């Protein structure tokens, strides 16, 4: 974070809003007639900074809310007579004892230490850190404990020491302005920003990204476009007097009688808010990042555009953008980073390098360090070198799981559709990202090169989870581990509700789209997702953090029902990431929205497919996984079953079994929670329960539909009558699960939950039922009209397959151990060993294969058979393969006569990395 100067004592107290020792000595700890003192050393170079003063204010207010006015002091001897002394200092307190704990602050950035002891004869807590951000986290930890406490200890009883350090260098939240109707209320609301930024800092996010120009994939078909090309909405640039924004419609899209220029007053109001937001972000020790995703100033094929930019030409465009950005950087000194989309969707044709060279002059000339974060799609060495030439820190932001949210690891491979091929290469606007760099679209591509001039940041795109409440601590911890995969910088999360109202689909009345006004929160809609932010923020900071960090919030909300509330949401939150990972009809969030799923037909030609970003024919069984290396499609799995082969991947049957387990656990927990009337009577508790029930319904639907798809594929291949009948039965079960869920949701959410203009991006669960019914009816007719084929051998195979698919998935159990390699020497073989044998002493002949690949999604996996001796398998990644610019990754497949099992595979919550990666190099 930026350098922060020590501020004078009087200013510090003013920022805290506290009284001095003399003025507050009479205010005591009411229950015992004793006082609490907060000691902040006046000359401490860390504790006496403005952001720490803000954090101390939070602690002061938390205690005040409990009826205690703490005494502020600058030295320990001013705290005499206290029942508790809280010392905020980067150096050891005077006249203090803290047991055997080291008398020194943490040394690594953003780390914190809270240790109990005694100061001036009183019980004491010492909060220490190596920098202001770590100190903020320590002080806010105490403030949060106080606010969530329900007894006289105020949550401040600490045994020993609390010591934490960040696992990820970047822990970011992005909030995008996509709708004039739905987003202006929060953009202009200063109280919203106070509360929202307080929450981000409390949950240990260290970066906030305000994104403009994020709502469209292309500068065409544009309607709602406020801030889409942001500069003229914010600043008046000298030398460009003719540049102005003309309003063509009302905010909801009704044409005006004549265009009206957006006023100087509105522009100044917009810019004043940007200055305010960036300053308030910095005041809490957060890095402020400004995202500018679109640099097009004209839209094509956009007759319904709400605005038009006048006064720019192709000749003045780049220089105008440079000069406008320079003004913004000068007037908003808290901007510490800029995020750019640099491929064709920005409106700048790929290969237009002079534009970016000109724009970057504003950054290199701003007089301070400003990070350049370039979106990875279409990135190439020319753009990387251009950014590095500015002398500024450079990051490349890769999508974590395409434009969706998968499980807590990085996909082991990309879909075949993302692999560059000559017949797929495009020219013109997307000559790079849809050409030889096609594999950069949805992942980390080939970014992990040794000696790179940039850092890698992952971005969790808002495709899978947008509208419903989600929060699984196990999954968040898994994402925390994978955010620094091979020493990446971390993760940026697109906030819940991202894209709400985009493409001119905004609807007044609140982004959460509830029917009941009691459930709406206006601009404070983030409060619905307070638990999501807490779980993800705290676990991105430290994946091993104590569960108390989120459970104390649950206890303050649900009381005795806290545990079952956590279990219900955690299991429900695994449904959609699992489906996204294992079965992806489109990588684009523009097309695929599994929360409100548009039905993909099982039966060929029963209805038009809503998706075409998937293998042909466009039916349910041919859809591949987002990770096709570890998950099989329905056709792939059924072919292996019918041919008597083995499939060394997780199957759709595995996925259905997991979904059934998660929904059963969530269902039981939410029923238990509902039985506690006091736990579900509040509006926020109703939000919790209803969203869990919707996700349970989705899980039941997909589990049954996957089984139906498997059975129908067997039927198509064999004509086996029973498989067809069971397919209809399972599809009927899926349909009933969806119908029941949708019917209840009709009483909770509006009929139009809008995330875009097309039917697939808006509407309600009830809207999707006719598509399901159409396909189910086609399946009934197909099965009823079929003739039993004469191939009895196929029928026998089908009978065995049907029996397998009608039960939960089962895998043989093995006792395995493997010590992952810590490093590799380029040019030398990387030897690995696996100790594996059947569990429970069973006698079974095993073989093992080693799968390996560079950490480069432009390459495919290789396989080598391992040598076995006494239950130990040995293999090696060849030296000529390790001699590369990339880290290496690997996993094992154990083979028996009738099965293939992955190792390490997944844990019970599907939240771990199912392979090993080695990025450190040795000589």
Where are the regions a protein language model picked out?
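Catalytic-core regions of glycoside hydrolase
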Residues: 64, 68-71, 76-78, 149-151, ...
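N-terminal secretory signal peptides and thylakoid transit peptides that target proteins
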Residues: 2-20
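C-terminal non-catalytic alpha-helical accessory regions
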Residues: 495-764, 768-769
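C-terminal segment of N-terminal export signals and the immediately downstream linker at the start
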Residues: 26-43
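Feature activates predominantly on carbohydrate-active enzymes
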Residues: 55-58, 62, 105-316, 330-334, ...
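Glycan-association/targeting regions that enable binding to alpha-glucans and other polysaccharides
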Residues: 779-923
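Second-shell loop/turn segments in exported
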Residues: 42-50, 182-186
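Short, well-ordered secondary-structure micro-motifs within conserved domains or adaptor modules
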Residues: 73-102
């Amino acid at each position: 974070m930026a350098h922060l100067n020590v501020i004078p004592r009087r200013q510090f107290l003013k920022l805290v809003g506290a009284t001095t020792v003399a003025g507050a000595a009479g205010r005591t700890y009411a229950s015992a007639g004793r006082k609490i003192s907060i000691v902040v050393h006046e000359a401490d170079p860390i504790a006496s900074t403005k952001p720490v003063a803000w954090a101390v204010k939070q602690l002061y207010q938390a205690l005040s809310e409990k009826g205690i006015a703490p005494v502020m002091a600058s030295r320990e001897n001013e705290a005499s007579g206290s029942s508790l002394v809280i010392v905020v200092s980067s150096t050891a307190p005077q006249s203090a004892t803290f047991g055997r704990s080291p008398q020194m602050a943490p040394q690594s950035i953003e780390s914190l230490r809270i240790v109990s002891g005694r100061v001036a004869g009183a019980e004491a807590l010492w909060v220490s850190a190596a920098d202001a951000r770590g100190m903020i986290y320590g002080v806010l930890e105490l403030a949060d404990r106080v606010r969530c406490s329900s007894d006289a200890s105020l949550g401040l009883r600490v045994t020993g020491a609390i010591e934490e350090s960040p696992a990820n260098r970047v822990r970011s939240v992005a909030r995008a302005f996509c709708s004039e109707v739905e987003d202006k209320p929060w953009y202009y609301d200063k109280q919203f920003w106070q509360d929202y930024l307080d929450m981000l800092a409390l949950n240990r996010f260290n970066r906030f990204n305000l994104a403009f120009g994020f709502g469209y994939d292309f500068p065409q078909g544009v309607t709602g476009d406020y801030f889409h090309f942001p500069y003229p909405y914010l600043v008046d640039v000298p030398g460009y007097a003719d540049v102005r924004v003309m309003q063509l419609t009302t905010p909801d899209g009704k044409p005006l009688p004549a265009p009206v220029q957006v006023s100087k007053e509105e522009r100044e109001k917009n810019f004043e808010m940007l200055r305010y937001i960036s300053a308030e972000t910095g005041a809490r020790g957060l890095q402020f990042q400004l995202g500018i995703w679109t640099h097009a100033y004209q839209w094509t094929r956009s007759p319904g555009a709400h605005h038009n930019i006048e006064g720019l030409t192709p000749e003045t465009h780049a220089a105008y953008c440079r000069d406008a950005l320079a003004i913004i950087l000068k007037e908003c000194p808290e901007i510490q980073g800029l995020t750019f989309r640099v491929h064709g969707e920005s409106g700048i044709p790929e290969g237009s390098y002079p534009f970016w060279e000109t724009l970057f002059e504003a950054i290199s000339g701003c007089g301070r360090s400003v990070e350049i974060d370039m979106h990875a799609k279409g990135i190439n060495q020319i753009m990387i070198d251009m950014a590095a030439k500015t002398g500024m820190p450079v990051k490349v932001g890769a999508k974590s799981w395409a434009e969706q949210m998968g499980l807590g690891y990085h996909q082991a491979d990309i879909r075949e559709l993302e692999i560059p091929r000559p017949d797929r290469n495009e020219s013109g606007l997307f000559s790079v990202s849809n050409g030889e760099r096609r594999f950069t679209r949805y992942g980390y591509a080939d970014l992990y090169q040794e000696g790179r001039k940039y850092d890698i940041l992952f971005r969790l795109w808002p495709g899978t989870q947008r509208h419903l409440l989600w929060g699984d601590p196990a999954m968040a911890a898994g994402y925390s581990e994978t955010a620094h995969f091979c020493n990446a910088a971390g993760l940026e999360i697109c906030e819940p509700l991202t894209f709400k109202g985009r493409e001119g689909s905004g609807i007044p009345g609140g982004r959460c789209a509830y029917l009941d006004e009691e459930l709406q929160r206006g601009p404070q809609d983030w409060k619905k997702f307070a638990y999501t932010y807490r779980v993800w923020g705290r676990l991105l900071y430290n994946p091993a953090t104590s569960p108390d960090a989120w459970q104390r919030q649950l206890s303050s909300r649900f009381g005795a029902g806290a545990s079952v509330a956590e279990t219900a949401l955690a299991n429900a939150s695994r449904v959609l990431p699992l489906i996204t990972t294992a079965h992806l009809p489109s990588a684009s969030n523009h097309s695929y929205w599994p929360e409100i799923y548009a039905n993909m037909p099982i039966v060929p030609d029963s209805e038009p497919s809503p998706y075409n970003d998937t293998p042909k024919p466009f039916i349910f069984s041919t859809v591949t996984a987002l990770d096709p290396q570890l998950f099989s499609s329905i056709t792939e799995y059924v072919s292996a079953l019918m041919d008597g082969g083995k499939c060394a991947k997780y199957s759709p049957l595995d996925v259905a079994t997991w979904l059934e387990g998660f929904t059963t656990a969530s269902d039981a927990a939410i029923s238990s929670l509902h039985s506690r009337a006091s736990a579900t009577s509040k509006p926020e508790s109703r939000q919790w329960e209803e969203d869990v029930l919707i996700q349970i319904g989705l899980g039941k639907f997909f589990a049954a539909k996957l089984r139906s798809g498997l059975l129908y594929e067997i039927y198509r291949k064999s004509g086996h009558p029973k498989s067809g009948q069971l397919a209809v039965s399972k599809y009927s079960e899926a349909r009933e699960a969806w119908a029941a869920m949708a019917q209840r949701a009709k009483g909770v959410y509006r009929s139009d939950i809008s995330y875009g203009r097309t039917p697939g991006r808006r509407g309600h669960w009830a809207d999707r039922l006719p598509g399901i019914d159409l396909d189910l009816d086609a399946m009934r007719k197909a099965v009823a009209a079929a003739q039993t084929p004469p191939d009895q051998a196929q029928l026998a195979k089908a009978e065995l397959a049907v029996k397998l698919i009608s039960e939960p998935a089962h895998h043989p159990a093995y006792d395995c151990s493997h010590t992952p390699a810590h490093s590799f020497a380029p040019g030398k073989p990387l030897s690995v060993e696996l100790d594996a044998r059947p569990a429970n002493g069973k006698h079974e002949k095993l073989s093992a294969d080693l799968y390996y690949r560079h950490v480069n999604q432009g390459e495919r996996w290789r396989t080598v058979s391992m040598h076995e001796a006494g239950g130990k398998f040995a293999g090696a990644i060849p030296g000529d393969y390790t001699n590369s610019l990339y880290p290496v990754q690997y996993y094992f497949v154990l083979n028996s006569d009738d099965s293939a099992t992955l190792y390490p595979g997944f844990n019970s919550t599907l939240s771990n990395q199912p392979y090993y990666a080695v990025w450190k190099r040795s000589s």
